[in-house]
């Protein structure tokens, strides 16, 4: 707002000098009227009140450590160097149980021949590993 045009004006566009006095002209102080006369404004601005949704109990939910096949493909040679995997018959043998990983997911590309041992595989991960000439071994 251009304030220059209010220079020399006593009330700067606020009407008479009484109009900007007190809290009554602005509907109360602070959060007053939040559930009464300011509620309509809050609804129009999209604020929401109260509880929403559902929170799952911690006993029900569990965190699964995962890895994507694309990451496995990139890290295969590094894992061999570190002694966490081995190469047999031209295939990288990776046991994910020893690494503390429970599930293999299918994001990424597989270019190497991988033989992966894990508790769980997603359908796309299993498909990509087997299409590249590798195999998936279910650990129990």
UniProtKB/Swiss-Prot annotation:
GO molecular function terms listed in the Swiss-Prot or TrEMBL record: rRNA binding; structural constituent of ribosome
Keyword Plastid: no
Keywords: Ribonucleoprotein, Ribosomal protein, RNA-binding, rRNA-binding
Pfam families: Ribosomal_L27A
GO terms classed as biological process: translation
Positions of disulphide bridges: none
Keyword Transmembrane set for record: no
A GO CC annotation given for this chain: cytosolic large ribosomal subunit
Summary of subunit composition and partner proteins: Part of the 50S ribosomal subunit.
Function: Binds to the 23S rRNA.
Name of the protein this chain belongs to: Large ribosomal subunit protein uL15
Name of the encoding gene: rpl15
């Amino acid at each position: 707002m251009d304030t220059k045009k209010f220079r020399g004006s006593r009330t700067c566009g606020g009407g008479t000098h009484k109009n900007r006095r007190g809290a009554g002209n602005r509907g109360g102080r602070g959060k007053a009227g939040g559930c009464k006369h300011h509620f309509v404004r809050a609804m129009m601005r999209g604020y929401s009140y109260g509880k929403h949704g559902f929170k799952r109990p911690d006993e029900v939910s569990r965190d699964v450590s995962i890895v994507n096949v694309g990451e496995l493909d990139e890290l295969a040679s590094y894992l061999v160097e570190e002694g966490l995997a081995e190469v047999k018959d031209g295939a990288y043998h990776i046991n994910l149980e020893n690494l503390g990983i429970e599930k293999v997911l299918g994001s990424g590309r597989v270019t190497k021949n991988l033989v992966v041992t894990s508790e769980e595989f997603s359908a796309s991960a299993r498909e990509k590993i087997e299409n590249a000439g590798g195999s998936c071994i279910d650990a129990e």
